[in-house]
Amino acid sequence: MIQDVIEKKLSDEFQPEFLKVINESDMHNVPRGSESHFKVTVVSERFAGLRPVARHRLVNQTLADELANHIHALAIHTYTTQEWQQMNQESPESPMCLGGSRKSAQ
């Protein structure tokens, strides 16, 4: 499973205090059982002193093979331990997909 690979790679690379990988493919217009849309939350001191774009680059580099071959969309939420505590240990919810056949009528 792609989700297992993502979890292992992020865990190995960042030794996170907290790691959550959610397959959000069911929120999108893809076949049932797909593994194409993911949300990752990574809490690691490795992000200390880095701007969000630099943190996201590190995650993207870690998952380069999966992004090139399997993952269509990746929502990335990265925090230091202190930032995570300030967020009340919750990452933002992802919006429902409005792409494909799920577009709302206007």
UniProtKB/Swiss-Prot annotation:
<comment type="function">
    <text>Transcriptional regulator that plays an important role in general stress response.</text>
</comment>
<protein>
    <recommendedName>
        <fullName>DNA-binding transcriptional regulator BolA</fullName>
    </recommendedName>
</protein>
<dbReference type="GO" id="GO:0005829">
    <property type="term" value="C:cytosol"/>
</dbReference>
<keyword id="KW-0346">Stress response</keyword>
<keyword id="KW-0804">Transcription</keyword>
<comment type="similarity">
    <text>Belongs to the BolA/IbaG family.</text>
</comment>
<dbReference type="GO" id="GO:0003677">
    <property type="term" value="F:DNA binding"/>
</dbReference>
<keyword id="KW-0238">DNA-binding</keyword>
<dbReference type="InterPro" id="IPR036065">
    <property type="entry name" value="BolA-like_sf"/>
</dbReference>
<dbReference type="InterPro" id="IPR002634">
    <property type="entry name" value="BolA"/>
</dbReference>
<dbReference type="GO" id="GO:0006351">
    <property type="term" value="P:DNA-templated transcription"/>
</dbReference>
<feature type="region of interest" description="Disordered">
    <location>
        <begin position="84"/>
        <end position="106"/>
    </location>
</feature>
<dbReference type="Pfam" id="PF01722">
    <property type="entry name" value="BolA"/>
</dbReference>
<keyword id="KW-0805">Transcription regulation</keyword>
<dbReference type="InterPro" id="IPR050961">
    <property type="entry name" value="BolA/IbaG_stress_morph_reg"/>
</dbReference>
